């Protein structure tokens, strides 16, 4: 089963948010941008996927393409256990 990777509304939202972030830097250099973006989107991503998977961690892990133990660690990190 091949998954299509489209550049849709999520990519557009991230791009817009980053453009706003760069504008607000006002000449300052950004630092740890990747970590910042991931930390901002990981919680709502986990919440949405767990809701869609009806709190089934195995199903959620498959949807995310990660190991169930990795998912459990991320849920614990965000207080979603």
What is each of the regions a protein language model found here?
Residues 2-11, 16, 23-81:
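Bacterial C-terminal helix-turn-helix
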